[in-house]
C-alpha cells in the first residue's frame, strides 16, 4: 500500500496539510518536539528534510536552516535516530526529503532500507533525474516506501505524461519556477497543470513552493490539488530563541492552516 497516496485519498472534501521542517534545526530536540506537535495539531503528512550544503531547490530560509543543522552535526545517521524516536508514536506518516548525492554516497539500497526500517513512509528527492528513477522505484517499492516525483511548471506535456506514467503514487507539483520560499500569491497556471495531470493519470497531487497562508490554501483547494506543502513558513517559526516559543509558534500556524484545508 502507498501510505502517502492513501493519506491524500482520505481527504475527498478537503486538502491534506503537509508541513515541512528541516531535521536538526535549530537542534535535534526541537525537531523531535516539533514532529510531535505537528502530529497532534492535525498535520496529515510531514516532510522531514535532511540537511544538505548544496540544496539548489531551496530558498534562503531553508538553506539557512540546513546550514545551522549541519553545523550542529545533523546528517543522515542523526535523521535516522529522529525517525527511530518518533515514528512509532506518530499517527502522521513521514516523508524523507534528501538530495540525491547523499543517497548515492550511502548506497541507494542501504539508504532506502534504513529509512524504511526507522519508520519513514515516503521519499522525495528534488534533484532526482527522471531518467534515473527506475532503480529507485523498484527499491522503494520493495521496502514499502512511496517515491514522489516532481512536475515543474516548465515541464512539457510530453514530460508530464512520462512522469505521471512512472510515478508509483502521488506527484509533487511545483507551484512556481525558482526556489522554495514564501510568496505573495500562487500562479493560476498551477490549476492548468493540475487539471492536465488529473486528465492523463489517476495520481494524487501535492503542491509546494511558496505556500504559506490560509488564503493561499483556500485558493488552491479549487484547483484539483489533494495536498499542500508548507515549508519556509514553518521553518521560520523554529528560529525563536526559546524552545517553548518555537513549538507554540508552529502549533498556532498548523492550526490556522489546517482550518483552511477544510471545506
From Swiss-Prot:
Q: Which reaction does it catalyse?
A: (1S,2R)-1-C-(indol-3-yl)glycerol 3-phosphate + L-serine = D-glyceraldehyde 3-phosphate + L-tryptophan + H2O
Give the main localization category: plastid
Which terms in the GO cellular component ontology are assigned? chloroplast; cytosol
Q: What class of enzyme is it?
A: lyase
Q: Does the keyword Nucleus apply?
A: no
Q: Which SUPFAM superfamilies match?
A: Ribulose-phoshate binding barrel
| Location in or out of the cell | Plastid, Chloroplast
Stored PROSITE patterns: TRP_SYNTHASE_ALPHA
Cite the entry's keywords alphabetically. Answer: Amino-acid biosynthesis, Aromatic amino acid biosynthesis, Chloroplast, Lyase, Plastid, Tryptophan biosynthesis
CDD domains for the chain:
Tryptophan_synthase_alpha
State the Gene Ontology terms under molecular function. tryptophan synthase activity
Would the keyword Chloroplast turn up in this protein's UniProt record? yes
Pathway of this protein?
A: Amino-acid biosynthesis; L-tryptophan biosynthesis; L-tryptophan from chorismate: step 5/5
Active-site residues, record numbering mapped to chain: 47, 58
What Enzyme Commission number(s) does the record list for this chain? Answer: 4.2.1.20
Q: Name one Pfam family in it.
A: Trp_syntA
Assembly and interaction partners:
Tetramer of two alpha and two beta chains.
The entry's function note states: The alpha subunit is responsible for the aldol cleavage of indoleglycerol phosphate to indole and glyceraldehyde 3-phosphate.
**NCBIfam families assigned to the protein according to its UniProt record, in alphabetical order:** trpA (TIGR00262)
Q: Which family does it belong to?
A: Belongs to the TrpA family.
The protein's name is Tryptophan synthase alpha chain
Q: What is the lineage of its organism?
A: Eukaryota, Rhodophyta, Florideophyceae, Rhodymeniophycidae, Ceramiales
Report which gene this protein is encoded by.
trpA
Amino acid at each position: 500500500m502507498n501510505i502517502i497516496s492513501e493519506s491524500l485519498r482520505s481527504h475527498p472534501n478537503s486538502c491534506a496539510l503537509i508541513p515541512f521542517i528541516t531535521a536538526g534545526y535549530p537542534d535535534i530536540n526541537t525537531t523531535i518536539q516539533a514532529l510531535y506537535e505537528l502530529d497532534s495539531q492535525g498535520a496529515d503528512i510531514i516532510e522531514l528534510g535532511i540537511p544538505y550544503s548544496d540544496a539548489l531547490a531551496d530558498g534562503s530560509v531553508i538553506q539557512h536552516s540546513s546550514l545551522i543543522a549541519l553545523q550542529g552535526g545533523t546528517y543522515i545517521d542523526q535523521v535516522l535516530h529522529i525517525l527511530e524516536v518518533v515514528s512509532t508514536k506518530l499517527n502522521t506518516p513521514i516523508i524523507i526529503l534528501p538530495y540525491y548525492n547523499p543517497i548515492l554516497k550511502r548506497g541507494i539500497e542501504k539508504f532506502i532500507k534504513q529509512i524504511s526500517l526507522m519508520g519513514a513512509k515516503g521519499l522525495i528527492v528534488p534533484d532526482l533525474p527522471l531518467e534515473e528513477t527506475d532503480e529507485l522505484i523498484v527499491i522503494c517499492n520493495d521496502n514499502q516506501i512511496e517515491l514522489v516525483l516532481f512536475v515543474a511548471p516548465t515541464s512539457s506535456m510530453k514530460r508530464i505524461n512520462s512522469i505521471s506514467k512512472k510515478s508509483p503514487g502521488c506527484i509533487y507539483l511545483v507551484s512556481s519556477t525558482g526556489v522554495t520560499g514564501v510568496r505573495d500569491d500562487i500562479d493560476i497556471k498551477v490549476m492548468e497543470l493540475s487539471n492536465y495531470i488529473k486528465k492523463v493519470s489517476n495520481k494524487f497531487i501535492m503542491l509546494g513552493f511558496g505556500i504559506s497562508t490560509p488564503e493561499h490554501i483556500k485558493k488552491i483547494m479549487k484547483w484539483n490539488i489533494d495536498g499542500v506543502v508548507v515549508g519556509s513558513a514553518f521553518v521560520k517559526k523554529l528560529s525563536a530563541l526559546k524552545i517553548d516559543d518555537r513549538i507554540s509558534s508552529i502549533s498556532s500556524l498548523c492550526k490556522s492552516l489546517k482550518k483552511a484545508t477544510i471545506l
